[in-house]
Amino acid sequence: MIYFSRKLVAIIVVIFAQSSLGTNAIQVNSQSLGQNGYVKYSNGLLIQWGKQPGSTASTVTIYLPTSFYDTNYVIHGCIIKDAYDENVYTATSLVNPTVSSFKMDRNFGSSSGTGVSRAKYSWMAIGRWK
């Protein structure tokens, strides 16, 4: 019984060491879980998201919460329409993406012609950070 606690600690250390062998689990490296946020994973994957408030400018620059490694990332977004909005929107054109920002074209078409949208915009970007 004298060495019971030492043996117990040794057994726990051995079990922990064996359970960690061959583990390829992807860990969260850092994160910011706000409305405009990101999650960085240990394998280099970076997922970012955010919302852009309405604007009357035809092109709006959206600054990413953190920078990507390069410009080979994908952006997906959607217009958040008001109930009375009868305009027609297509995929939003993206202009000159950089590692820390992208520009979004806010034009639309309607039965009375074309114009600049004041609608809110929600987006998500996926790429790498290392």
Could you describe each region identified by the protein language model?
Residues 34, 38, 42-130:
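Extracellular attachment/recognition segments
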